[in-house]
Structures are given as C-alpha cells and as structure tokens.
Design a protein with these regions (language model features):
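N-terminal mature ectodomain segment of secretory-pathway/periplasmic proteins
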Residues: 1-36, 40
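Short beta-strand segments
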Residues: 5-9, 29-31, 47-51, 106-108, ...
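A generic structural signal for short beta-strands and their flanking turns/coil linkers
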Residues: 7-9, 15-17, 34-36, 47, ...
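General beta-strand recognition
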Residues: 20, 32, 37-39, 49, ...
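Beta-turn initiation residues at beta-strand->coil junctions
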Residues: 23-25, 42-44, 122-125
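Acidic/charged, solvent-exposed loop-and-adjacent secondary-structure segments enriched in E/D, K/R, S/T
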Residues: 40-67
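Anionic-ligand binding region
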Residues: 64-82
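Gly/Pro-enriched, hydrophobic low-complexity segments
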Residues: 76-163
C-alpha cells in the first residue's frame, strides 16, 4: 500500500488495563477493554468481536505494554528503553522485553512533551507496518466506569475469533 490509511477519533486510558478507542471516518470502529474483555465493534457491519483477557490471552501483553508506555508505569520492567532529550520534550524507543510482547510488535516509539504527556506513538509491527497515533486535548480527569463498558446492540453479530 502506497498511501497510508488515516483516521481520527478519541482514546481513553485507565491503568493498568482499561481503555476505549473510538475511530471515526469511512471505517468507524469502537474498541473497549474493561480489563477482563476486549470488544471491537464495527458499526458499518453491525458486527463485534469479543476477546477474553487474562488466562494468558495473547492480547494481554499488548494492552499492558501500551498502557504501561503511555502512563509511564513500570515501563522500565516492560521495555528496554533508549531515550533522548529533544527541544520540547523527550523521545523514547521502547523495545519489548518479554517473548509474548515481542510476538505482537517490534518496538514502540513514544514522544513526550516537557510535562511528560504523550504526544505521539509509532508502533512498528512484525510485518513492517507502522501505526502512528497523535495525541491532543489530554486531560487527567477521572473517568466514569461506564467509559470502559460495552454491550452490543440487539442484532449485532458477535464472534469470538480466539475461541474464548
């Protein structure tokens, strides 16, 4: 693919393993994790994928890694870190330490501003693809528990791709 796929949306994180990602545009999706289940909903297709977390799910380490990096919690135990100071913040190259994380991605580049807030991430996947996310309008306000809940609408086709 010569042209990158570009989308916009919103993302919320709550350590250690809760997040919500709403993607808008031609291919909208909603991804929600409450720490026990991960849902990916595709409104255009009225379909949802449900993944169980915990019990050594292959998704656990990926979710933990991203949350760890963005919240700078236990990041030194999760990644090998190569960092440098830049004019308006810091750039960190985070390489996964564990085999389970290494099976999900090669590295995560994280750009932080001087207030240590994430501005940009770039994840290098195993196949060479890159996922770049730019963060803005950040807040540390408390989030209601419902932010990390998902119930499929009636008529939604629900699958469990990992069979759990």
């Amino acid at each position: 693919m010569k042209k990158p796929v570009v989308s916009s949306g919103k993302v919320w994180f709550q350590p250690p393993n809760k997040f919500r990602r709403e993607v808008k545009g031609n291919s909208p999706s909603l991804t929600v994790s409450d720490g026990h289940q991960l849902w990916i909903y595709y409104p255009n297709f009225k379909s949802a994928e449900r993944y169980s977390l915990g019990k050594r799910s292959p998704l656990d380490s990926a979710i933990a890694a991203i949350n760890s990096a963005l919240n700078l919690e236990d990041v030194e135990n999760t990644f090998t870190i190569n960092a440098r100071k830049i004019d308006d913040g810091y750039e960190l190259e985070l390489t996964p330490r564990t085999p389970s994380m290494k099976s999900v991605f090669r590295k995560l580049n994280l750009r932080l501003n001087n207030n240590l807030r994430a501005e940009r991430t770039e994840m290098l996947q195993l196949n060479g693809d890159r996922i770049v996310t730019i963060y803005s309008n950040q807040t540390r306000a408390p989030l209601p528990a419902s932010t990390f809940e998902f119930t499929p609408a009636p008529g939604t086709d629900v699958t469990t791709p990992l069979g759990r």
